[in-house]
Amino acid sequence: QASVSIDAKFKAHGKKYLGTIGDQYTLTKNTKNPAIIKADFGQLTPENSMKWDATEPNRGQFTFSGSDYLVNFAQSNGKLIRGHTLVWHSQLPGWVSSITDKNTLISVLKNHITTVMTRYKGKIYAWDVLNEIFNEDGSLRNSVFYNVIGEDYVRIAFETARSVDPNAKLYINDYNLDSAGYSKVNGMVSHVKKWLAAGIPIDGIGSQTHLGAGAGSAVAGALNALASAGTKEIAITELDIAGASSTDYVNVVNACLNQAKCVGITVWGVADPDSWRSSSSPLLFDGNYNPKAAYNAIANAL
């Protein structure tokens, strides 16, 4: 692991966590990955084990072995957990996406949220209740949930989640929320303002922050725009940056540091070989699980 924990240094500035992702495969494939997580990160998001295809592959038949492993590892090592994700159009079993009856889909939606959240009630800091529900132009994506239920699925999902675990922070999460003035950012802000005014219990906006090289400089403005929607908090939820330049990473960390509502940052992976975009070397540890220049730059900046 690194000589200094960026999580500890980030928390010293009043933030809640600087975390990463994990699941049984990456936590057991070698000893270096879990050692780095224990030493240098303060929060874990399950990479895949809490997605719908993993937790309810068949209607009413829930499988929690993968998510249990992640939650148990996180709890036994004192890490906060972000639950990810309850409702998403992707990694969605065919039995869900083929539902055409509104009342059936509402029932399925409520049951899925209730069952998954109940299992981990009191153990999860925040849930990504809805993931990637916007188009790039800021309109709502034509998912099965939107097409069959209508926009009201947003209210149903958040109200169900709130009733199950009142202490968990409830988030709406999306990507390409990385530049102020971009249509998707504007759409997120205007919709969340409207939903909050209608009493829908949204606590936070999650910005995935999957960036190209050089894009770190725009994140501060983007976070300020997202904060204007009126949620209690915001977070950077899936950070990785092509090329992993120190400048980009420090810009992103400072953006969260300087936005009072930004509670934490989750980096989407520990070391480059395990990244979903490994060819662009976007993470803070290299193929030998050694900290890269960007890691040390963050530590120095903090």
Swiss-Prot record:
Pfam families xrefs: Glyco_hydro_10 (PF00331)
Keywords carried by this UniProt record: Carbohydrate metabolism, Disulfide bond, Glycosidase, Hydrolase, Polysaccharide degradation, Pyrrolidone carboxylic acid, Secreted, Xylan degradation
Positions of post-translational Pyrrolidone carboxylic acid modification: Q1
SUPFAM superfamilies, alphabetized: (Trans)glycosidases (SSF51445)
Pathway(s) the chain acts in: Glycan degradation; xylan degradation
Domain GH10: 21-301
Secreted keyword on record: yes
Keyword Magnesium: no
Annotated catalytic residues: E132, E238
One function term, GO molecular function aspect: endo-1,4-beta-xylanase activity
Chief location of this protein within or outside the cell: secreted
Disulfide bonds: C256-C262
The enzyme's E.C. designation: 3.2.1.8
Assembly mode: Monomer.
Family per record: Belongs to the glycosyl hydrolase 10 (cellulase F) family.
Name recorded for this polypeptide: Endo-1,4-beta-xylanase
